[in-house]
């Protein structure tokens, strides 16, 4: 997907990028490739592939109408090089973005990226989701939590749901259909007073399969969750 094709798809969805926004995406691509030589950020470095499989893929929740340009508080868990939240922030500057990542080198990259892109309303924290999820500064404070190819839902739910306000949403982006995964996650979702409201398969413009799953938080999370770092993965609910 060329940058021009990317812009055109957005126009078809009623979003016309300003010159500043186009430049932000160009700068994002440049910094991603530059920094990828120092630290492992992505296996995808070809420009057209980055625009398709990182930028376009990241804004799927916007293109499908699940996120609008309002002062939403969004937490991105395990964002790595900033996906999906930074492309969404470029598109919709009104949203407030927080990223938690377990690798400090990636946090350093994100700080430089945000500075170069002149983004405000972005916050980056180094650490484990399990630890932050028990911190009252972060717990039950977000409208939306996003996670792109982070973990299977049985694990992901415990890592993310505690951060949400009641009626907040987890938006999980994955490369494949999620039906079996969601069956395995039924107990975890019930334990965390949450339920699946959207499970949608779709395709990227090149035909690659993708899935978006949205989970809504119905009641406050029991205090014992999330359990200590590493436990959700070793002993899923």
From Swiss-Prot:
One of its GO terms (cellular component) is cytosol. Belongs to the methyltransferase superfamily. RNA methyltransferase RsmG family. Its EC number is 2.1.1.-. It comes from the Bacteria. Residues 216-237 are annotated as: Disordered. InterPro entries: rRNA_ssu_MeTfrase_G (IPR003682), SAM-dependent_MTases_sf (IPR029063). It is found in: Cytoplasm. This is Ribosomal RNA small subunit methyltransferase G. Keywords: Cytoplasm, Methyltransferase, rRNA processing, S-adenosyl-L-methionine, Transferase. CDD domains: AdoMet_MTases. Specifically methylates the N7 position of a guanine in 16S rRNA. GO terms for molecular function: rRNA (guanine-N7-)-methyltransferase activity.
């Amino acid at each position: 997907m060329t940058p021009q094709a990317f812009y055109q798809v957005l126009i078809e969805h009623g979003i016309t990028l300003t010159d500043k926004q186009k430049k932000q995406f160009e700068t994002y691509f440049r910094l991603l490739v530059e920094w990828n030589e120092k630290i492992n950020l992505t296996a995808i470095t070809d420009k057209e592939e980055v625009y398709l499989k990182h930028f376009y893929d990241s804004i799927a929740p916007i293109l499908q109408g699940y996120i609008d340009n309002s002062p939403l508080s969004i937490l991105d868990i395990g964002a790595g090089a900033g996906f999906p939240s930074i492309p969404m922030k470029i598109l919709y500057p009104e949203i407030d973005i927080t990223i938690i990542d377990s690798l400090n080198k990636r946090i350093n990259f994100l700080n430089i990226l945000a500075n170069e892109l002149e983004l405000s309303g972005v916050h980056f924290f180094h650490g484990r989701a399990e630890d932050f999820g028990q911190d009252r500064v972060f717990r039950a404070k977000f409208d939306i939590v996003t996670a792109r190819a982070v973990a299977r839902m049985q694990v992901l739910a415990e890592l993310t749901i505690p951060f949400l306000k009641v009626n907040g949403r987890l938006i999980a982006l994955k490369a494949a259909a999620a039906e079996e995964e969601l069956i395995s996650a039924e107990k975890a979702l019930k334990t965390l007073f949450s339920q699946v409201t959207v499970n949608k398969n779709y395709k990227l413009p090149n035909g690659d399969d993708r899935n978006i799953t949205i989970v809504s938080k119905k009641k406050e999370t029991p205090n014992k969750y999330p359990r200590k770092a590493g436990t959700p993965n070793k002993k899923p609910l």
